[in-house]
Amino acid sequence: TCKDSCGYEVKALNSDYFMDSTQIRFDNLFLKDSYSTVNARYLSFGYTKGRDINDYVNKIVMGADFFNTTLDFRTVGVYAPTLKDNRLQMLIDGEVIGPVRDLRSKDLRVRMGDSTDVRVGVAITGLPNIDSTYFNFTFKDVNTIMPEVAEIVSSFAPSFKRETFDKIVPDVRLNVQGIAYGTLSDVYSTGTITTRIGDIDYHAQTYPDLKGNGRDVSIEIGAENLDLGHITSSELLGKGTLSTAIN
């Protein structure tokens, strides 16, 4: 095992190692830290000349093809203290390429919980300063259920009450297409949710609360031809228009 000055600790590491004049490459990589497990078909660091290492963030082009990689947000919390108690876990598959300051993936698959399966395009700019890093996600195909959505949102915004969400959002399987962008402390998302009881347009944002002790969340929902009877468990209501907001 080894630990860096920030407290990140590697528990196990195994790989085939190669090096030539243009890259350093690890094939069949396995890495385990205190919370996460990384599996990658390859991890590479490309350069045009040796002294590029002096400007690692901008000039070293990284590449990695992850499979069955488990990311626990407590690992990220080593470098981003606001996430140090966040126990959300993601199972990641897909290829990521770029220098540290501009990482991108055209098609990344992320699974969370028992029912959430996400395919996204990702652009991450601004690392290694995690607090000011800008994230941009394009949701290509998202399949999930509302209880898991509420659980994910509450893991980033502890003041968000899942019970409030359950009162106005039906517990059904849904497909989401849309975008999300922002920093770890301020995220905005908009898109369309497709369900068997109707389609819902949403706008959502998490942001620091006024007291600076955590995050608040704001959600606006609008729908037409939504099965209000299903939501309210009432046979007296049929399809209708819904517009509501949660803060």
Feature locations, PLM:
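Long, contiguous interaction/targeting segments characteristic
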Residues: T116-V118
